[in-house]
């Protein structure tokens, strides 16, 4: 019998890196809402009393970046110095943006596929490798450790926003360790929650007593509600529960650590359970295959698992800048496939159009911000881009494609 423990982490929307991801994607939403053909590569940096946005944007949209940045920071919960030391109203907002390089624009606008098909004429915005993954551990076909970590992080933010626990502050992290037997989850080994909090908790000032109180409240208001509908639940008797292991977490957010767009790419994807091509998502328009092709790879992998062609699937795609068709496609089913991996790879090549233009069209990636009232990508920037059940993501809707694939068996 093979036994092992696998661990994944998530972070809340108030984590410094996640503030930056949300700022970058809010800028992307604002540009695409007014001009769906906008080219955006927006990075953000936060530090004590400062938010900088930089990168390259070519767009007809008129965006008040200063106002937008402050609105994002305020919505996360940093409304005054007492909300964790970072204040949306008084922090400095610096803007240093250029236009997209004409060399890159040429490669995207005029792909070298020598075809009259409009979808062949949209080249990849850069070279790179992207991975997509799915497995049957959860209903949303995600690995259980990252799914649980996100559930806890979302719930942690919710109880703060709703003031069910009124001493919590925006910064926080979760980590879940799951025990496996023969590749199947069998128990929740450890849950770790680190959450920023006020220096005084309901009149309690002694560090050890504060830690005990926080642990009690988090189990009742976060852990139990976040896992109540799961067949595999944490148990007080057997699941190790760690809360703020250093003793206290008062200084947090940008006051405690600088943040940067694109530094939580494992949190954004599969929690380390599958490989990663290295490219971040936030702040990038859909012509950047780091983002759009990673979404497509997830769609492919999830469709294959949903069609019962395998229990676990990883899909690798690769692209060259200015070229529409993928350079390579590879499927690995880890020995769980109903057919060979080479047959699955051929099936993907035959049944999925993975050109950037086709991906953008199929998922409507350039129009979704305007269709959703000016906000789409920003909602993906915290709590993961895959397996979401709280927002509608087109690359997660594989029901029709899975049905089509099932008929091919």
Swiss-Prot record:
Write the Enzyme Commission number(s) for this entry. Answer: 2.5.1.6
InterPro entries in the cross-refs: ADOMET_SYNTHASE_CS, S-AdoMet_synt_C, S-AdoMet_synt_central, S-AdoMet_synt_N, S-AdoMet_synthetase, S-AdoMet_synthetase_sfam
Any one Gene Ontology BP term: S-adenosylmethionine biosynthetic process
The pathway entry for this protein reads as: Amino-acid biosynthesis; S-adenosyl-L-methionine biosynthesis; S-adenosyl-L-methionine from L-methionine: step 1/1
**Could you tell me what reaction this enzyme catalyses?**
L-methionine + ATP + H2O = S-adenosyl-L-methionine + phosphate + diphosphate
Q: Where does ATP bind?
A: 15, 171-173, 248-249, 257, 263-264, 280, 284
Q: How many cofactors are bound and how?
A: Binds 2 divalent ions per subunit. Binds 1 potassium ion per subunit.
Q: Please give the residue ranges the record annotates as the region Flexible loop.
A: 100-110
Q: Which residues bind Mg(2+)?
A: 17
- Tell me yes or no: is Transferase among this UniProt entry's keywords: yes
Q: Where does K(+) bind?
A: 43
- Keyword ATP-binding listed: yes
Gene Ontology CC annotations of this record: cytoplasm
Entry's Gene Ontology molecular function annotations: ATP binding; magnesium ion binding; methionine adenosyltransferase activity
In which residues is L-methionine bound?
56, 100, 257, 288
Record key words, sorted: ATP-binding, Cytoplasm, Magnesium, Metal-binding, Nucleotide-binding, One-carbon metabolism, Potassium, Transferase
**Cell location:** Cytoplasm
Q: Which family does it belong to?
A: Belongs to the AdoMet synthase family.
What function does this protein fulfil?
Catalyzes the formation of S-adenosylmethionine (AdoMet) from methionine and ATP. The overall synthetic reaction is composed of two sequential steps, AdoMet formation and the subsequent tripolyphosphate hydrolysis which occurs prior to release of AdoMet from the enzyme.
Q: How does it assemble?
A: Homotetramer; dimer of dimers.
Q: Which HAMAP family match?
A: S_AdoMet_synth1
Q: What is this protein called?
A: S-adenosylmethionine synthase
Species of origin: Prochlorococcus marinus (strain NATL1A)
UniProt lists the gene as: metK
């Amino acid at each position: 019998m093979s036994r092992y423990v696998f661990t994944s982490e998530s972070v809340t929307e108030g984590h410094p890196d996640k503030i930056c991801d949300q700022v970058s994607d809010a800028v992307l939403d604002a540009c695409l809402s007014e001009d769906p053909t906008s080219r955006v590569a927006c990075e953000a940096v936060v530090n004590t009393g400062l938010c900088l946005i930089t990168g390259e944007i070519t767009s007809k949209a008129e965006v008040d970046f200063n106002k937008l940045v402050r609105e994002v920071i305020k919505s996360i919960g940093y409304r005054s110095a007492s909300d964790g030391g970072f204040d949306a109203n008084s922090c400095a907002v610096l803007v240093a943006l250029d236009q997209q390089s004409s060399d890159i624009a040429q490669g995207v606008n005029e792909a070298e596929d020598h075809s009259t098909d409009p979808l062949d004429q949209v080249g990849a915005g850069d070279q790179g490798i992207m991975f997509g993954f799915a497995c049957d551990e959860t209903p949303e076909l995600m690995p259980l450790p990252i799914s649980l970590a996100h559930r806890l992080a979302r719930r942690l933010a919710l109880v703060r926003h709703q003031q069910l626990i009124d001493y919590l502050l925006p910064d926080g992290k979760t980590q879940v360790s799951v025990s496996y037997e023969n590749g199947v989850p069998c128990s929740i080994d450890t849950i770790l929650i680190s959450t920023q909090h006020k220096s005084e908790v309901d009149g309690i000032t002694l560090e050890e007593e504060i830690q005990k109180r926080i642990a009690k409240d988090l189990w009742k208001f976060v852990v139990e509600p976040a896992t109540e509908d799961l067949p595999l639940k944490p148990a007080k008797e057997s699941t190790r529960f760690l809360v703020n292991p250093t003793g206290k977490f008062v200084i947090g957010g940008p006051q405690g650590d600088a943040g940067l767009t694109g530094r939580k790419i494992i949190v954004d994807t599969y929690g380390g359970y599958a490989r990663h091509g290295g490219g971040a998502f936030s702040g990038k328009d859909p012509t950047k295959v780091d983002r759009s092709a990673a979404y497509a790879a997830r769609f492919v992998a999830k469709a294959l698992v949903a069609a019962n062609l395998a229990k676990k699937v990883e899909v690798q795609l690769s692209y060259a800048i200015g070229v529409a068709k993928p350079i390579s496609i590879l499927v690995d089913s880890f020995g769980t496939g109903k057919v060979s991996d080479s047959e699955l790879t051929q099936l993907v090549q035959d049944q999925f159009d993975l050109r950037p233009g086709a991906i953008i069209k199929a998922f409507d990636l350039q129009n979704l911000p305007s269709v959703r009232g000016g906000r789409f990508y920003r909602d993906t920037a915290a709590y993961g881009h895959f397996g979401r059940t709280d927002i509608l993501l087109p690359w997660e809707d594989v029901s029709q494609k899975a049905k089509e694939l099932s008929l091919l068996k």
